[in-house]
């Protein structure tokens, strides 16, 4: 499993546990990171820049430190 996919799962769990609208939150994170969560699969290759952007977007949108 890739690091990007692991981040996706952790973000989705945070959205679910906080009772937030998944479409809205995933959309906001996708716009900020430039990476749509739906397209991150277990075989998505890790890219350090994409990982950093996704972590930053999760912190800004969900106040989630990954």
State where each predicted segment sits.
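A short, Lys/Arg-rich alpha-helix, primarily the initiator
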Residues: 1-18
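Generic structural marker for isolated residues within well-ordered, non-membrane alpha-helices
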Residues: 11, 22, 55
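Short alpha-helical "recognition helix" segments of helix-turn-helix
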Residues: 24-26
């Amino acid at each position: 499993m890739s690091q990007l996919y692991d981040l996706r799962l952790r973000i989705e769990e945070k959205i679910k546990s906080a009772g937030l609208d998944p479409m809205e939150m995933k959309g906001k994170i996708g716009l900020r990171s430039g990476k749509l969560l739906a397209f991150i699969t277990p075989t998505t290759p890790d890219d350090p820049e994409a990982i950093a952007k996704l972590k930053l977007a999760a912190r800004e949108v969900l106040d989630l430190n990954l």
